[in-house]
A protein has these predicted regions:
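Acidic, Ser/Thr/Pro
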Residues: 1-162
C-alpha cells in the first residue's frame, strides 16, 4: 500500500475534542489502512503529577467518593489515568468503523474479506473518506500524534459469474 495522506500534531494536557480529516479515495484504491499513533499514554511521573494537580484531582474525586481522597487514593488515581483517543472512519457518509482498543496505536484496515475489530465489511467502494479522531483525555503536555492513511489496489473480482 502507498501513503495517501499524513497528518500530525501535538496535543496539550487536558484537551478534549474531535479532529476531522476528509479526502477523496482515488480511483483504483480498493483497500485502506488508517493508522493513528501517539505517545505518552500514561502519566510519566505520577507523584509529580499529583503534587502539581492535587487540588483539581481532589475536586474531581470528592463527588464520587463522598469525601476527600487519601494520599494513597490520589496515587492510585494518578497511576490509572491515561490518554484516551479513538479512531473512526466513514466512507461516503456511511460508518465504516471505530477503533478504541487500549494502546498508542490504533489501526483501521478496510480490505475486501478482511476487517479490523470494530469495523464493518468493506466492498472497495470509492468516495469521500472522513476520519474522525475522538480525543477524550490527554494526560501529558506536548503529546505528539501521527495519522497515516494508506491505500492500494487490492484484489477486486470484477466478474463473479465466471
Amino acid at each position: 500500500m502507498e501513503t495517501l495522506q499524513t497528518f500530525h500534531g501535538v496535543l496539550d494536557r487536558g484537551f478534549t475534542g474531535n479532529m476531522s480529516f476528509q479526502f477523496h479515495i482515488p480511483h483504483g484504491i480498493h483497500e485502506l489502512s488508517v493508522i493513528l499513533t501517539y505517545e505518552k499514554e500514561r502519566i510519566q511521573d505520577p507523584a509529580s503529577y499529583i503534587e502539581r494537580f492535587r487540588h483539581p484531582l481532589i475536586r474531581q474525586a470528592v463527588p464520587y467518593l463522598g469525601r476527600i481522597p487519601t494520599d494513597r487514593q490520589l496515587q492510585e488515581m494518578g497511576q490509572a489515568m491515561k490518554t484516551e483517543i479513538q479512531l473512526c472512519a466513514m466512507i461516503g457518509g456511511v460508518f465504516a468503523g471505530n477503533v478504541h482498543m487500549p494502546g498508542t496505536r490504533k489501526e483501521i484496515l478496510l480490505k475486501e474479506g478482511v476487517r479490523s475489530r470494530g469495523c464493518l465489511p468493506y466492498d472497495g467502494r470509492n468516495g469521500m473518506v472522513k476520519i474522525i479522531v475522538n480525543v477524550y483525555q490527554v494526560v501529558e503536555e506536548n503529546t505528539p500524534w501521527n495519522l497515516e492513511i494508506k491505500g492500494g489496489p487490492g484484489h477486486v473480482e470484477t466478474d463473479r459469474t465466471a
